[in-house]
From Swiss-Prot:
Keyword Phosphoprotein: yes
Main location: secreted
Tissue spec. comment: Mammary gland specific. Secreted in milk.
Gene Ontology cellular-component terms listed: extracellular space
Gene that encodes it: CSN1S1
Protein name, UniProt field: Alpha-S1-casein
Amino acid sequence: MKLLILTCLVAVALARPKYPLRYPEVFQNEPDSIEEVLNKRKILELAVVSPIQFRQENIDELKDTRNEPTEDHIMEDTERKESGSSSSEEVVSSTTEQKDILKEDMPSQRYLEELHRLNKYKLLQLEAIRDQKLIPRVKLSSHPYLEQLYRINEDNHPQLGEPVKVVTQEQAYFHLEPFPQFFQLGASPYVAWYYPPQVMQYIAHPSSYDTPEGIASEDGGKTDVMPQWW
């Protein structure tokens, strides 16, 4: 039993590691390892801190870039406002000038309109005169009523004690006295009846035999007389 216990102890002792031989190496390498650890920690801190700094820097840059266009927009807006105000002033000045020009041109336009109306009126008068001149001259021989009126006009002047006026056929066609001409002669075959004082004197007076005569009856006692028209 004792031998077995000894053999077990020896085996355990042999199986254990030899620590005393390794410790000096560890102790020699300890400072280097500490420095390396510190360096590694610094590197890790830098690696951790750098993204935050980069983020802040990027944020600042973005803010700056955003502020720059806003400033540019503000400048552009001010320039636009100034240009709009200047253009509006120009438009107002141009409109006022146009109004002044129109006010100045109004009298001239009215004068031109009046001249135009007068010219139209004169043209109408000339056309009316030309139409009167171009009216066909109808001979009195083709209108016996006109001949009769012409003769009556000539006969009435000596009776009234007025000087005889020389009247041509054309004047007799357009003007007959003593009545003014309100219509065109020759338009109707019964024109002569519109001149009763001149025409009635040539109407035959009723003769004596046209008067009614009483016819007495054979019976003398009766006094009734019956008129009879022939």
